[in-house]
Amino acid sequence: MKVNNVEFEFNISSLKQASALELALDHMGEREKKINKKKADPNSRLTEVLSDTLDMFRQFFIEATTVDLLQECDDVREATGIYYRFLDEVKKQKDTITEPYSTDRIL
């Protein structure tokens, strides 16, 4: 798989990697709740929210793939785009393994 000009191995058909992805998504949800609380606090600084958001994405990628796909990224919009491109690639893989099996394919 290649995302953000980084080539790495990730196969959603691997039970180990699928489990890592699910766990990373769970942890991301927890981090997002904390960020949302910070966003709602009028005393929070924008730089804190941006930093926490970048860290949330960075930790997600490291937990899910063991690779820091953000590298030197310091832009939340760019990080969000990288996240969605990764999910698009995972969806493509998932679609191929969840296709219905048919005996017509072997005959």
What is each model feature region?
Residues 1-46:
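Short N-terminal mixed-charge amphipathic segments
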Residues 43-72:
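Short hydrophobic interaction/assembly module
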Residues 22, 51-55, 77-84:
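Non-catalytic, well-ordered alpha-helical scaffold segments
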Residues 27, 31-38, 60-63, 89, ...:
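Surface-exposed polar/charged interaction patches
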